[in-house]
Amino acid sequence: MTVDRCLIIRRDSNTLSQEYAKICADSVERCNMKSEYIKAVENLGVEDAAASVGMKVDWEMAEILENTITDHKECQEMGNVCCTASHIKAFRRVVEIGKPCAILEHDAYVMRNFRNFEVPDNYLVFLGPRMRDTKTYVPRSRVRRLIPVQQAIGTHAYAITPETAKGMLKHLEEVGLVYGIDHYLFMNNESKVPIIAADPYPAICWTRKSTMNDVKEEVDGPRGVWGGQNDKNVLGITTPGLLEGLGCPIYV
């Protein structure tokens, strides 16, 4: 089956998130697709965020992961754990709908209608990378093929089927909410669900001011605009076959 709709994760208490989500929803509508909002989990610590989506926390596993996954400690920060819980809410909604859906974070931007391909069970379909803005990249066509990749950057735009969502929910219920969603899906692929990338990419994430500045905790380190995938000092994770479809410069 093709994607039925886009599920846009939105922080209802944050004005910036609402603005970004509206831009995202408008881009979906312009591409003749439908969308709905997923109310994000906000301002909860690890255990409360997990409980809000029916999950537990395995602290022993979290400690093991902290010693084996680079930067895993940040997965337990409020903003990141709430983001993970929000994606779990989206997984559950996909199961409720009973049809494939695209899950979009509020800063995603859809460039072309992507209801022209079947979303396969037990795969993560990566829909697009980060870009500096919404004008740098224009896909040359609708999605022509799906290419296997080992990993990708960002959880801002991807598609899954109800079967895939059920499998990930079952796994997360077993291990608990210990993974950050980036590590779980695309960066480390701890879910073990194979990744395929749409070629050309039909969606992007655009560089913007972060909405994580208002989380109710003291966190060391930078917050705000992040554009690492367009930084020549950061290796871009991509596949040569995707470059033709990109039709724009990308550092590799």
Predicted segments with their positions:
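An acidic/histidine-cluster motif and surrounding catalytic segment
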Residues: 1-104, 108-252
